[in-house]
Amino acid sequence: MAANAFVRARIDEDLKNQAADVLAGMGLTISDLVRITLTKVAREKALPFDLREPNQLTIQSIKNSEAGVDVHKAKDADDLFDKLGI
């Protein structure tokens, strides 16, 4: 695909410099990041990252789930409801 269009955005200069430094450490430029991000958005029809910040309860629940803490396994919904007593 030919790169023949330009994208411009106004951002804080300090933010731009900080991001450019981080990306340079990864071997990328800001243009590379924009190209990668827009390609993923076009292909997946969604943002390639989550804009929401989980609260502490959600973070702890995810950690517990990944560790297998308080995880209930069931063959179907009725079995799960029976195990949970509902």
Curated annotation (Swiss-Prot):
Keywords: DNA-binding, Repressor, Toxin-antitoxin system, Transcription, Transcription regulation
UniProt KW DNA-binding keyword: yes
Result for mutant: R8A: Does not bind to dinJ promoter
GO function terms (MF aspect): cis-regulatory region sequence-specific DNA binding; toxic substance binding
Signal peptide: none
Effect of F49A: No effect in vivo, in vitro forms a complex with toxin YafQ which is not able to cleave RNA, i.e. does not release YafQ. YafQ-DinJ complex binds DNA
Domain of life (superkingdom): Bacteria
GO biological processes: DNA-templated transcription; regulation of DNA-templated transcription; single-species biofilm formation
InterPro entries: Arc_rbn_hlx_hlx (IPR013321), DinJ (IPR026262), RelB/DinJ (IPR007337)
Impact after mutating K16A: Does not bind to dinJ promoter
Function: Antitoxin component of a type II toxin-antitoxin (TA) system. A labile antitoxin that counteracts the effect of cognate toxin YafQ. The YafQ-DinJ heterotetramer binds the consensus sequence 5'-TTTGAGCTACA-3' in the dinJ promoter; DinJ also binds DNA but not as well as the YafQ-DinJ complex. Binding to the dinJ represses expression of the promoter.
Assembly: Probably a dimer in solution, forms a heterotetramer with antitoxin DinJ, with 2 YafQ-DinJ dimers associated via the N-terminus of the DinJ antitoxins (YafQ-(DinJ)2-YafQ).
Family: Belongs to the RelB/DinJ antitoxin family.
Identification of the protein by name: Antitoxin DinJ
Gene designation: dinJ
